[in-house]
């Protein structure tokens, strides 16, 4: 008769300081299919070590161990996990049920790692619990089950994948006599159904119920009667086999790992929430800074554009502050006409200005009077609250008309509904008000100077008596590169003047400088927020490391029922990523609340959440979970199942 399990000259020793302590010494043993064997011995005799080797939880230091003819020493860790999963079922003295799972979910664990479809394994788990008399306790957690009921759940778990070999370590040690008898009766029934049952015990009454008693003392077998071949009534229950394609097995495995991770998180809600807190704050900081910073940047750029978008100013001289008399009259009206003819020019306006007194009735105020063309307001993107700008005829006739700014209107006409047609004195010249320009808010604040605008011909001839222009402002057409336009403008005027007696000021350079400055500031603040996210990630790693330590026995149980190192790695990594993703979602919600509150207090700000910001937050959460969850997950996957099961 060929042995199902065969040990040949097996020894097992462990390092103790600089020495090796032998626990098993030259063990040779054969166990046949369908036997019920008891391994007895006092504490420290090596019987538990022998059981670990039989169950492929441990490997011998020397000698050969074969399972159904396969040499275990030739198998890698994944193959050993498969062997445990498909051939062995473990029953422990302390049951080793996972407290956050129900009875049925505990029974399903081996089938989860075997890749069995959910419906099939749920049906099998309920069938096994029904057979063991626990049909009314299927959805109960272990804390609501008696010791005997918990051990029956443990037996059902051992049978989930078929359980060809049942390894029972002191199965009645924690039970009362009645429950112990029930468990032993179940084990005998399993023996009768063709299962190979190996009981490790120090109780002679339990051992006496086995067909064969193997006694071990000080690491050596001192009594080993020959096996007795018996005919069994039935064969071993066939395990449920997974026939799904590879990609479906992977998807199922990932889904189950996600489900187990969620259950583990739900079992420690407060700790999970505190772990998430750092991620919530970090993600909220990053997202808030990105969206609020973007809103602030757009507001700054809008204010700059309000000063004149896509405009180029031309001034006489070499630079600002140059009052050399030879350059004072550099810009002429003919220059303006030549500029207006260029195909890339949208509009152009001259400018002459002087500080004057403005009077209406008994009100006398100081204003800055500007001589401009009718295109001035188009160049600077200004709209009218009342009336309109001056036309070409008024400019040609040097008409005595004026446009007021909103502040000047309030000073002169605080109680009038419409001021168009009113006559005021600019200097000593009476002029008719034809419009009120809408004031535009600026990031630099509003000037304390009151502004009025007259036709430049009126200003030059009637008030100032000069034929040259103080400056020209050009608005470039949309789509035209302002730098190229500036170069062409410089070339045009240099050719006309025969020299470069002017300088230009491109508002786009101000815009680009502001964009660069706001981007730098936003980047700096984002880096500060990322630091808080990193701190949150370190918190996740710290808690996950603690979790691995606290759940060491759970890891050992999972490995005993067939989990591979990669399964354990996947589960703990998914837990870390899930914590970070949920924390990220809450962080995004918090940032939306912050944005909502800011808009209540800062109504002018347009805060919006782009898909880019949300996708970035999602990726940050995922990356943080992977980065800071890797070390704890790797530590969990590297645990030795024997050491893990021995931890309290």
From Swiss-Prot:
InterPro entries: AAA+_ATPase (IPR003593), ABC3_permease_C (IPR003838), ABC_transporter-like_ATP-bd (IPR003439), ABC_transporter-like_CS (IPR017871), MacB-like_ATP-bd (IPR017911), MacB_PCD (IPR025857), Macrolide_Exporter_MacB (IPR050250), P-loop_NTPase (IPR027417). Residues 5-243 form the ABC transporter domain. PROSITE patterns: ABC_TRANSPORTER_1 (PS00211), ABC_TRANSPORTER_2 (PS50893), MACB (PS51267). It is found in: Cell inner membrane. GO terms for biological process: response to antibiotic. It comes from the Bacteria. Its EC number is 7.6.2.-. Pfam families: ABC_tran, FtsX, MacB_PCD. One of its GO terms (molecular function) is ATP hydrolysis activity. GO terms for cellular component: plasma membrane. It is a multi-pass membrane protein. ATP binds at residues 41-48. The chain crosses the membrane at residues 273-293, 417-437, 523-543, 577-597, 611-631. Keywords: Antibiotic resistance, ATP-binding, Cell inner membrane, Cell membrane, Membrane, Nucleotide-binding, Translocase, Transmembrane, Transmembrane helix, Transport. Part of the tripartite efflux system MacAB-TolC. MacB is a non-canonical ABC transporter that contains transmembrane domains (TMD), which form a pore in the inner membrane, and an ATP-binding domain (NBD), which is responsible for energy generation. Confers resistance against macrolides. NCBIfam families: PRK10535.1 (NF007826). Homodimer. Part of the tripartite efflux system MacAB-TolC, which is composed of an inner membrane transporter, MacB, a periplasmic membrane fusion protein, MacA, and an outer membrane component, TolC. The complex forms a large protein conduit and can translocate molecules across both the inner and outer membranes. Interacts with MacA. Belongs to the ABC transporter superfamily. Macrolide exporter (TC 3.A.1.122) family. This is Macrolide export ATP-binding/permease protein MacB. It comes from Salmonella typhi.
